[in-house]
Amino acid sequence: MNLKLWIVNILTLIRIIGTIILIPIYNIYGGKVVGIVSLICYLTDSIDGILARKWKVSTFFGALFDGFADKLFTIINFIVLYLITPYALIPIIIEILIIIIQMIKFSRNLNIQANVVGKLKVWVLAIGVVLTFLASDIDNIYFLSLEIKNFVLNIPDNNLYLILLGPAILMELLTLLSYIFEMFFPKNIEILTNKPSKIKIPKLNFEEKKDYIKNVWLSPSFYEKHKDDTNLRDLRKLSKKN
């Protein structure tokens, strides 16, 4: 694996590590520090994608690894937010439904890449989540003026958190609906105009298959060739040992 590919995957790994430490950090340091950690994790989500495309090191492993990190981070983040406001339960439920829908699409051999709505959702979530954490611990944000702190503190908690998380909840719902639409109406313009190629699975022995899997999952050229294929079930078969 070349250095650039390592860097991209390490950035994704940082997000997973950040996810694991969110709850203990919140219990020890409160919302301000968790908000900062969340912001760093959201930035790695953007940076690793930008670098992967710029350096042309996108792979199927990276795409799945990144997707797993995103979902894990989002759900754990909202679980921590649930300790602050019950409104956080709504996006948790929607995220679980999105995962189920994506699994169904995958089982039907449909493309499970994030669409435009899903990509926009990430940034709306980032803003809402970070601001909610910071607002919950605003007394400990020392660089803010007393006027700003008093203004925020005078807003009832339910109203404040609904204002901050409302757009994120709306984007979660729109993303879910868009994926449901794609599941029932998969023949969109892209598929109609670009017929997907067939990923052929050669007959290999166990050792050869291991090498082939490595080349498939970690090969940027293979990813670029097949990233828009709808027949991803063939790729899934390559990951099986039997």
Q: What do the predicted segments below correspond to?
A:
Residues G49-K54, Q102-I112:
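C-terminal ends of transmembrane helices
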